[in-house]
Amino acid sequence: MHEKSLTELRAALTARECSAVELAQLYLKRIEAANSLNAFIQVDPDLTLAQAKAADALLHTGHAGPLVGLPIAHKDVFVTKGWRSTAGSKMLSNYESPFDATVVARLQNAGMVCVGKTNMDEFAMGSSNENSYFGPVQNPWDVKAVPGGSSGGSAAAVAARLAPAATGTDTGGSIRQPASFSGITGIKPTYGRVSRYGMIAFASSLDQGGPMARSAADCATLLNAMAGFDGRDSTSLVRDDEDYTRYLGQPWKEDGAGKPLAGLRIGLPKEYFGAGLADDVRASIDAALKQYEALGATLVEVSLPKTELSIPVYYVIAPAEASSNLSRFDGVRFGHRAAEYRDLLDMYKKSRAEGFGPEVKRRILVGAYVLSHGYYDAYYLQAQKIRRIIAQDFQEAFRQCDVIMGPVAPTVAWDLGAKGDDPVQMYLADIYTLSVSLAGLPGMSVPCGFGAGANAQRPVGLQIIGNYFNEARMLQVADAFQRATDWHRKAPAGV
């Protein structure tokens, strides 16, 4: 049963092959058995089974929606009533929210059953899920490897079949990169598509929630429930509701002569295929592109000339916003408070020094510096100007193509601990995802192969980038690939 997709699980529930309670119990047992992966921060069988019983009651009416009774894991950056919501940090290790994040509420209202809160890099700052106060997450494909970050717990949970789907967030690649490293499908929607209300903030102009699952079809079904305007989020977009599944299985053009993607133009940025791309990743991406050509698509070279500037731009803007957002965690209203202190100022200092981990402190310091008097114009304002140019470069490219494709990361997953002492090397791993986030565009990762040699068990993801509000078409393109290949069906050994 754990090998079934969301659609297949829903069919099993409808046919009474199993109940929502039995399904929840199955995944709870799997989570317990795979505890060594450290994919979950919190599991509460009582809360999970109570939701499952309510879902069964709804299923018995015969009028349940497509997600009723299906299990989901939530990244622990979404506040969830009744559960601890930690953001992977000591600062919030005992925090319980009095309300649900909009994403959590919408999926719960759709009837989904929460099986637990997944591990993550502290406050979503990281590319390896090694920055969590609750310990690193292991990659189910190779337990010596990182699962990617910051949504590494969600990616590992879906890859190891501990949940059929999970929520994630993407600030600079935190859905796409762990999806690539863990061999699953994940999509970052257009900025503003999914409400940030109740999502513990890292960088407010970049943060975006999205689904992580086995397939593009499952992600489309989840996005139907997650997306939509929310008046409680000032950055939420006012758009007509969409059915993100509407193009699945449909040809790109009606007169495609039997080829499902005839007429599709795929842009290949020359900057994504330079010397820094590992040979085994390049081989998998090239094979995927050949498959797209077989499906009828045409490959077009495009240019994104400011790609290399996305790293310095991101690591000015994101830390600046983080230093502001995280200033609220002072040990007064909520969060960790130092046990001993001399006065109020000493309490602030000690509480924040004890509550935040090294990477979070590093980014707060960088952010405070670039926002300080005398440096704001030289760093923050300049970065915002280049950000606008990066977005314009994408629009120029989209005049020549319908979607853009390339690698998600320059390499497959690296070994746990391999880059912990060199944060710059960790930052460079986001070279292909940061510009998409800076532009606010939708992007996704689709499994397309594996590494070579010692990395032969480590997955490779193909990145698909669409223009604003083009998620339904992106999902169509990804789904066509998955109908023709079986990379997304492969599972780690022993799963």
Swiss-Prot record:
Q: What is its EC number?
A: 6.3.5.7
Active-site residues, Swiss-Prot/TrEMBL: 75, 150, 174
The Gene Ontology biological process annotation of the record reads: translation
Q: Name one GO molecular function term.
A: ATP binding
Against Pfam families, the record matches this protein to: Amidase
The record's keywords, sorted A to Z, are: ATP-binding, Ligase, Nucleotide-binding, Protein biosynthesis
Q: Which GO terms describe its cellular component?
A: glutamyl-tRNA(Gln) amidotransferase complex
Its EC top class is: ligase
Highest taxon of the lineage: Bacteria
Parts of the chain that traverse the membrane: none
Disulfide bonds listed in the record:
none
Q: Is the keyword Aminoacyl-tRNA synthetase assigned to this protein?
A: no
- Known catalytic reactions: L-glutamyl-tRNA(Gln) + L-glutamine + ATP + H2O = L-glutaminyl-tRNA(Gln) + L-glutamate + ADP + phosphate + H(+)
Q: What interactions and quaternary structure are annotated?
A: Heterotrimer of A, B and C subunits.
Record-stated family: Belongs to the amidase family. GatA subfamily.
Any idea what job this protein has?
Answer: Allows the formation of correctly charged Gln-tRNA(Gln) through the transamidation of misacylated Glu-tRNA(Gln) in organisms which lack glutaminyl-tRNA synthetase. The reaction takes place in the presence of glutamine and ATP through an activated gamma-phospho-Glu-tRNA(Gln).
UniProt name for this protein = Glutamyl-tRNA(Gln) amidotransferase subunit A
What is the originating organism of this protein? Paraburkholderia xenovorans (strain LB400)
Q: Source taxonomy lineage? A: Bacteria, Pseudomonadati, Pseudomonadota, Betaproteobacteria, Burkholderiales
